[in-house]
């Protein structure tokens, strides 16, 4: 009889730092810049990638030192997770916090990121480099509700 994976055995609070980090599927959606409406506080996703995001791999170029390079970079923690209502519906942190299973394409289930990229969950199909953007409002998009 096989043992259940850690994300089915533990709460988010009980996970080790390594387990917590491994939940990230590496889609890069957190690394897309967001715009906030000053009147309504509504958050809009853009397809504008952070300067540190390698769009092809959807990985941070300087993950260990990302806050030095990008002071506005998001640090998702167990404590602040509830404040990130904008996390995509496919986000493992959000799904597990809501008592939902990981989607079938998640790298922890498939062993690679290929299925995630194939399902077009990652941003590598839509992201543009920040250095090429003139008018950020032209890059507002609606991300699909793709949790599976």
From Swiss-Prot:
InterPro entries: Puta_zinc/iron-chelating_dom, UCP006173. It comes from the Bacteria. Belongs to the UPF0260 family. This is UPF0260 protein KPN78578_22800. It comes from Klebsiella pneumoniae subsp. pneumoniae (strain ATCC 700721 / MGH 78578).
């Amino acid at each position: 009889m096989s043992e259940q994976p850690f994300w089915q055995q533990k709460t988010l609070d009980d996970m080790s730092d390594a387990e917590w980090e491994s939940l990230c599927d590496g889609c890069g959606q957190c690394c897309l810049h967001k715009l906030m409406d000053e009147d309504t506080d509504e958050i809009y996703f853009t397809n504008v990638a952070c300067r540190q995001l390698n769009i092809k791999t959807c990985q941070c170029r300087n993950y260990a030192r990302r806050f030095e390079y990008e002071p506005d970079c998001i640090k998702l923690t167990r404590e602040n997770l509830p404040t990130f209502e904008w996390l995509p519906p496919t986000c493992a942190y959000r799904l597990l916090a809501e008592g939902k299973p990981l989607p079938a394409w998640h790298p922890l289930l498939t062993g690679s990121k290929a299925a995630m990229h194939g399902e077009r969950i990652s941003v590598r199909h839509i992201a543009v480099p920040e250095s090429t953007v003139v008018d950020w409002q032209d890059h507002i998009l609606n991300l699909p509700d793709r949790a599976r």
